[in-house]
């Protein structure tokens, strides 16, 4: 159990003490590298830890959810399922839209995933419907990731169709080309088209069918190659008037002749310029608009991407007419910048508080300047390494540097205090610097490497949480390493040049008063320590009680995953009865918008109705509520959400689900609430049986709120039951029936108009305003084999049934997602346990599997690994300390201080009403590294006193405790004040920082009080144990 003797010649610090110019220039180089690194570092909310995610969207207007599932989604899923590196595949098939989200392993590059997706789409092409208007389109974007920027385009003078056309060609395409942009979507569905609305009675009276009209239009509007003539002297390209560009041209189109007279399209239909899809709409506040949502690619830097968009916007909007107004409704980077700025301010506050506490203890300006230089130098130098590692300035790295403020000053304080002690004894400053630095060098190395050992397990945390805290752990470790280098080089050199007996003895009224105060505190501590050493077993029982209390608090404290942030943006889903039409839903949405916009915290609102890549059915609407900046509103986001939901409850027939947007997005599906739980089965029938039963029980749980499900199986279906025998007798096939129905009610895209800038569609449908509702089916006519016109009603009956509004898959099997929030008086851990207990009471069949998704799944994973993470940190520290001390016993003495940190942190979190989440757990792990510093400083000096002065273990540890009391108190207060700004944080992003500060401040206060007494007692008990063990071995050897 011997340690290396401290050197009196300066050890590794001697070279730097004796060469002040070289040392100064070396530090200047570190400072300049850090400043350059800081200017080069990108800014972001959190480290870039996104899963490589690709979304594949296929539109098939008029197709029902079951047709989309079987004809589009399933063939694509089979191909995608063969890709390597695929982590999860989810899909949503609704009326006319299939959306497949592919999430890949973190280790797979996004570009590689993109190539595999493109190859899979190509392989599935022959399996998809032949009349699919457009092939599947993929985007490198996570649909659950909220847009980084939302813009509204409005006009008081132009129709929305023209506005969307201009925005799509002049603005959206250019923004899509910006590096980092994954997808630009235009919500509002006002893409220009020529709409042909057939008068069913008119065509029936003329003996025509919709298929006759469709064939006439498709044959009259073509755009194909015609060849060229190559003569002896000239070459001539052939062209023709085969394209029709306007609604007026289509009106004049002759579709048939009757009795020698032409029948024009305008005679049997209303032909007009309109929108390609009349069941889509978007609004900005109360005004109809084209809403442009910009989403980033996974892994792209959000700040630089948004900056590029803003720089380009003025140039893009110049090309638009003056009546067209482009407004930025939301920009997520505004809150990200504010959050980072607040964290930087807290970092500056931490540095100021730490320097203040140094002056309070040292009471000497030159002695205060030395650590005052070491702290910012260590932190600034870290930026240079961060650039090399491709890190960013984000909330977590800045939190690491803020916490590091208390860490890095420790080393300088320990060195200065030890050197000052020798100067006060009469040593020359140079000799004192050499002797003091050499004596303390081993302690600094022990402190540094044992603290870094605590951080090592963070690097091995799995999945996205591990990636998230990788930058935190490495940034903190680098700052600690640089601090150790500075403390062993610059600090002793400055002590040798700036400290003297005169400067240390020079006192004013404040220093004399504080000196007396510290002397009284040390004397009182000495008296208390003597009493404690006389009652070792009582003290040991207190230490064991803290261990037991830590375990109990760990079991009972509310547990969460990640703090809910207030980013100033709320995502909402509006739900209406399943049979709601587009017009009905649009009206309800406007009613809800009126209510929301009256709230004093709301700045703007965008809303969308219709089926697209994010909205699965006509009975739901998507909302984005943009709040005023935090300093301009009285309430935080959770209170605003509660107030809005209460207000909207007064609107009949709708349910509103709200959740605040978060910087960390783990989900791959746009959800109604923050947390998800899925049921997966081999068939839809099994889900239809068990989902309602589970929902009924979950909605009764007090641990859950806003419980809802995406299972909607009460969508109205008009089932056309064809008498196949009768149809066959008339020469009518099922394809003829499907075509007739599709022509009438599918907003069928039957032809394409080509222009120099864009392509537009011709849309065919029946004019349902003439014959609304199910009566429109009685107007359908088909052509028999002999050319006669046959009413559909003569060969078919229409039955009203129910069917799902959307069909969801997870890894190719049907799935239902139950979404929920957690009330304020419960934690996510409570909710998860309640769901699991409820599931057990149902006795679900074996063919139904359940699983938490997104943040909830990550919470389970993180919670399961937390205990092992802490154990790994303790084991890593034990190994490092054992190697440094060449002892099996002393590391245990040092680690015995850890339960006190756990008790303090957990108690502080419970008193503050905070959950034990991932951020708080990181704080507890850091406490393990801080608290053991006290024990290291005590034990190092006690061992030295035993070895060099021949003291007894009791006298040695007693003297070590008194000698090191002031630096222990100083370093603990420095670490506490470094964490204090985080605990008291109230600005943007405070929710993320506060748990770390609360846990560390609580842990430091409790551990500081207890370890000053428990550590020396445990040191003596283990010393007696070691002596007893040696005597036993010696006795056995003598007997042998």
Curated annotation (Swiss-Prot):
Induction trigger: The mdtABC operon is transcriptionally activated by BaeR.
One GO cellular component term noted in the UniProt record for this chain: plasma membrane
Main localization category: membrane
Regions crossing the membrane: 16-36, 347-367, 369-389, 396-416, 440-460, 472-492, 537-557, 863-883, 888-908, 911-931, 968-988, 998-1018
Keyword Transmembrane: yes
Gene3D superfamilies (alphabetical): Multidrug efflux transporter AcrB pore domain (3.30.70.1440), Multidrug efflux transporter AcrB pore domain like (3.30.70.1320), Multidrug efflux transporter AcrB TolC docking domain, DN and DC subdomains (3.30.2090.10), Multidrug efflux transporter AcrB transmembrane domain (1.20.1640.10)
Keywords: Cell inner membrane, Cell membrane, Membrane, Transmembrane, Transmembrane helix, Transport
Compartment(s) where it occurs, according to its Swiss-Prot or TrEMBL record: Cell inner membrane
Pfam families to which the protein is assigned, alphabetical: ACR_tran
NCBIfam families recorded: PRK10503.1 (NF007798), RND_permease_2 (NF033617)
Family indicated by similarity: Belongs to the resistance-nodulation-cell division (RND) (TC 2.A.6) family. MdtB subfamily.
Function comment: The MdtABC tripartite complex confers resistance against novobiocin and deoxycholate.
Entry protein name: Multidrug resistance protein MdtB
Gene that this sequence comes from: mdtB
